[in-house]
Amino acid sequence: AIDLRGHGESEAAKTMRWNRIADYVDDVSHAVEIIGGKPILVGHSMGGFICQHISHRNEPVSGIALLASAPHYGVWRLVFRMLVKDPLALILSFAKLSLLPVIRSTHAIRDMFLDANTPDPKVKAFGAKLIDESFLAFLDMLLLDLPKRAATIPPMLVIGGEKDTVCLPSEQQSLADYYGVACHIIEDAPHNLMSQTKWQEAADKLAEWVETRA
Protein backbone atom coordinates (compact mmCIF):
# COMPACT_ATOMS: atom_id res chain seq x y z
CA ALA A 1 0.00 0.00 0.00
CA ILE A 2 1.14 3.54 -0.73
CA ASP A 3 1.19 5.99 2.17
CA LEU A 4 0.62 9.46 0.74
CA ARG A 5 2.63 12.31 2.25
CA GLY A 6 1.50 12.96 5.81
CA HIS A 7 -0.37 9.64 5.93
CA GLY A 8 0.66 6.40 7.63
CA GLU A 9 4.43 6.14 7.89
CA SER A 10 5.18 8.77 5.25
CA GLU A 11 6.78 12.04 6.25
CA ALA A 12 4.97 15.31 5.66
CA ALA A 13 6.79 17.78 3.41
CA LYS A 14 4.46 20.48 4.70
CA THR A 15 1.49 20.83 7.02
CA MET A 16 -1.26 18.42 6.00
CA ARG A 17 -3.69 21.30 5.48
CA TRP A 18 -1.71 22.60 2.49
CA ASN A 19 -1.43 19.33 0.55
CA ARG A 20 -3.12 19.37 -2.84
CA ILE A 21 -4.49 16.51 -4.92
CA ALA A 22 -1.65 17.21 -7.36
CA ASP A 23 0.83 16.48 -4.54
CA TYR A 24 -0.79 13.10 -3.91
CA VAL A 25 -0.81 12.32 -7.64
CA ASP A 26 2.92 13.02 -7.67
CA ASP A 27 3.35 10.64 -4.71
CA VAL A 28 1.63 7.83 -6.61
CA SER A 29 3.57 8.57 -9.79
CA HIS A 30 6.80 8.38 -7.81
CA ALA A 31 5.75 5.05 -6.29
CA VAL A 32 4.93 3.65 -9.74
CA GLU A 33 8.39 4.68 -10.91
CA ILE A 34 10.06 2.98 -7.94
CA ILE A 35 8.02 -0.23 -8.29
CA GLY A 36 8.83 -0.50 -11.97
CA GLY A 37 7.07 -2.67 -14.52
CA LYS A 38 3.40 -1.93 -15.05
CA PRO A 39 1.61 -2.27 -11.70
CA ILE A 40 -2.13 -2.31 -11.17
CA LEU A 41 -3.36 0.59 -9.06
CA VAL A 42 -6.22 0.14 -6.61
CA GLY A 43 -7.64 3.36 -5.17
CA HIS A 44 -10.33 3.71 -2.50
CA SER A 45 -12.39 6.89 -2.00
CA MET A 46 -9.97 9.82 -2.40
CA GLY A 47 -7.43 7.27 -3.63
CA GLY A 48 -9.74 6.48 -6.52
CA PHE A 49 -9.94 10.18 -7.33
CA ILE A 50 -6.14 10.31 -7.38
CA CYS A 51 -5.99 7.24 -9.62
CA GLN A 52 -8.31 8.96 -12.09
CA HIS A 53 -5.75 11.75 -12.37
CA ILE A 54 -3.07 9.12 -12.94
CA SER A 55 -5.13 7.62 -15.77
CA HIS A 56 -4.51 10.58 -18.09
CA ARG A 57 -0.82 11.04 -17.29
CA ASN A 58 0.37 8.12 -19.42
CA GLU A 59 1.84 6.40 -16.38
CA PRO A 60 3.07 2.83 -17.02
CA VAL A 61 0.22 0.98 -15.29
CA SER A 62 -1.58 -2.10 -16.56
CA GLY A 63 -4.89 -1.27 -14.92
CA ILE A 64 -6.73 0.87 -12.37
CA ALA A 65 -9.41 -0.37 -9.97
CA LEU A 66 -11.62 2.24 -8.32
CA LEU A 67 -13.18 1.15 -5.02
CA ALA A 68 -15.98 3.35 -3.65
CA SER A 69 -14.22 6.18 -5.46
CA ALA A 70 -14.96 9.87 -5.36
CA PRO A 71 -16.61 10.52 -8.74
CA HIS A 72 -15.02 12.31 -11.67
CA TYR A 73 -17.31 15.33 -11.33
CA GLY A 74 -16.27 15.96 -7.74
CA VAL A 75 -17.83 15.59 -4.31
CA TRP A 76 -20.31 18.47 -4.41
CA ARG A 77 -23.24 16.06 -4.13
CA LEU A 78 -21.71 14.63 -0.97
CA VAL A 79 -21.38 18.16 0.43
CA PHE A 80 -25.06 18.78 -0.31
CA ARG A 81 -26.01 15.54 1.47
CA MET A 82 -23.90 16.57 4.45
CA LEU A 83 -25.58 19.97 4.48
CA VAL A 84 -28.98 18.29 4.72
CA LYS A 85 -27.93 15.61 7.22
CA ASP A 86 -25.72 17.62 9.60
CA PRO A 87 -25.45 21.30 8.61
CA LEU A 88 -23.63 22.29 11.81
CA ALA A 89 -20.85 19.77 11.15
CA LEU A 90 -20.39 21.10 7.64
CA ILE A 91 -20.34 24.73 8.83
CA LEU A 92 -17.72 23.84 11.46
CA SER A 93 -15.63 22.07 8.83
CA PHE A 94 -15.49 25.14 6.62
CA ALA A 95 -14.96 27.45 9.59
CA LYS A 96 -12.05 25.37 10.92
CA LEU A 97 -10.73 24.28 7.50
CA SER A 98 -10.89 20.74 8.83
CA LEU A 99 -12.90 17.62 7.99
CA LEU A 100 -12.83 16.30 11.56
CA PRO A 101 -16.16 17.93 12.58
CA VAL A 102 -17.89 15.74 10.00
CA ILE A 103 -16.82 12.61 11.91
CA ARG A 104 -17.32 14.00 15.41
CA SER A 105 -19.79 11.32 16.57
CA THR A 106 -19.97 7.54 16.71
CA HIS A 107 -23.16 7.70 14.67
CA ALA A 108 -21.50 9.73 11.91
CA ILE A 109 -18.49 7.40 11.69
CA ARG A 110 -20.69 4.31 11.48
CA ASP A 111 -23.01 5.91 8.95
CA MET A 112 -20.20 7.08 6.69
CA PHE A 113 -17.79 4.16 6.78
CA LEU A 114 -18.97 0.97 8.48
CA ASP A 115 -21.62 -1.73 8.54
CA ALA A 116 -24.84 -0.52 10.16
CA ASN A 117 -24.62 -3.17 12.90
CA THR A 118 -21.03 -2.38 13.94
CA PRO A 119 -20.99 -2.14 17.77
CA ASP A 120 -19.96 1.12 19.41
CA PRO A 121 -16.58 -0.12 20.75
CA LYS A 122 -15.48 -1.12 17.25
CA VAL A 123 -16.73 2.17 15.81
CA LYS A 124 -14.76 4.10 18.43
CA ALA A 125 -11.64 2.02 17.76
CA PHE A 126 -11.99 2.73 14.05
CA GLY A 127 -12.58 6.43 14.70
CA ALA A 128 -9.42 6.65 16.80
CA LYS A 129 -7.40 5.74 13.71
CA LEU A 130 -8.89 8.48 11.54
CA ILE A 131 -6.80 11.56 10.87
CA ASP A 132 -7.70 14.92 9.42
CA GLU A 133 -7.33 15.35 5.67
CA SER A 134 -6.03 18.34 3.79
CA PHE A 135 -8.84 20.85 3.38
CA LEU A 136 -7.24 22.08 0.17
CA ALA A 137 -7.32 18.54 -1.20
CA PHE A 138 -10.99 18.41 -0.25
CA LEU A 139 -11.60 21.65 -2.17
CA ASP A 140 -9.72 20.15 -5.12
CA MET A 141 -12.12 17.20 -5.05
CA LEU A 142 -15.05 19.57 -4.69
CA LEU A 143 -14.26 21.75 -7.68
CA LEU A 144 -10.69 22.98 -8.07
CA ASP A 145 -8.91 19.97 -9.58
CA LEU A 146 -11.27 17.50 -11.21
CA PRO A 147 -9.77 14.65 -13.27
CA LYS A 148 -9.94 14.82 -17.04
CA ARG A 149 -10.66 11.84 -19.24
CA ALA A 150 -7.78 11.07 -21.55
CA ALA A 151 -8.33 9.90 -25.12
CA THR A 152 -6.72 6.61 -24.13
CA ILE A 153 -7.02 5.22 -20.62
CA PRO A 154 -5.70 2.03 -19.02
CA PRO A 155 -8.15 -0.82 -18.32
CA MET A 156 -10.34 0.14 -15.38
CA LEU A 157 -12.83 -1.42 -12.98
CA VAL A 158 -15.32 0.25 -10.64
CA ILE A 159 -16.56 -1.43 -7.45
CA GLY A 160 -19.03 0.23 -5.09
CA GLY A 161 -21.05 -0.60 -2.00
CA GLU A 162 -24.84 -0.73 -2.00
CA LYS A 163 -25.02 0.91 1.45
CA ASP A 164 -22.31 3.50 0.81
CA THR A 165 -23.49 6.94 1.95
CA VAL A 166 -20.26 8.73 0.97
CA CYS A 167 -19.89 7.63 -2.65
CA LEU A 168 -23.33 6.41 -3.64
CA PRO A 169 -23.93 3.35 -5.88
CA SER A 170 -25.48 5.65 -8.49
CA GLU A 171 -22.31 7.74 -8.46
CA GLN A 172 -20.22 4.62 -8.99
CA GLN A 173 -22.36 3.68 -11.98
CA SER A 174 -21.98 7.20 -13.40
CA LEU A 175 -18.22 6.92 -12.88
CA ALA A 176 -18.11 3.59 -14.71
CA ASP A 177 -20.25 4.96 -17.54
CA TYR A 178 -17.96 7.98 -17.87
CA TYR A 179 -14.94 5.77 -18.44
CA GLY A 180 -16.88 3.12 -20.35
CA VAL A 181 -16.00 0.30 -17.95
CA ALA A 182 -17.77 -2.30 -15.81
CA CYS A 183 -19.32 -1.44 -12.46
CA HIS A 184 -19.97 -3.95 -9.69
CA ILE A 185 -22.07 -2.96 -6.68
CA ILE A 186 -21.53 -5.17 -3.63
CA GLU A 187 -24.83 -5.86 -1.85
CA ASP A 188 -25.09 -4.44 1.70
CA ALA A 189 -21.51 -3.13 1.60
CA PRO A 190 -20.71 0.30 3.15
CA HIS A 191 -18.04 2.80 2.08
CA ASN A 192 -15.20 0.81 3.64
CA LEU A 193 -16.29 -2.25 1.71
CA MET A 194 -12.79 -3.77 1.76
CA SER A 195 -12.74 -4.15 5.56
CA GLN A 196 -16.35 -4.92 6.50
CA THR A 197 -18.42 -8.11 6.36
CA LYS A 198 -18.67 -8.13 2.55
CA TRP A 199 -14.90 -7.74 2.07
CA GLN A 200 -14.55 -11.21 0.55
CA GLU A 201 -17.04 -10.48 -2.23
CA ALA A 202 -15.28 -7.22 -3.04
CA ALA A 203 -11.89 -8.94 -2.96
CA ASP A 204 -13.12 -11.73 -5.25
CA LYS A 205 -14.40 -9.23 -7.83
CA LEU A 206 -11.09 -7.42 -7.72
CA ALA A 207 -9.08 -10.65 -7.96
CA GLU A 208 -11.11 -11.87 -10.95
CA TRP A 209 -10.41 -8.62 -12.76
CA VAL A 210 -6.72 -8.61 -11.84
CA GLU A 211 -6.36 -12.09 -13.33
CA THR A 212 -7.58 -10.73 -16.67
CA ARG A 213 -4.78 -8.18 -16.55
CA ALA A 214 -2.04 -10.74 -15.86
Description of each model-found segment:
Residues K38-V75:
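Conserved hydrolase catalytic core segment
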Residues L100-F138:
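Conserved alpha/beta-hydrolase catalytic His-Asp/Glu region
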Residues T152, V158-G160, D164:
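Short beta-strand/loop motif that positions the catalytic acidic residue
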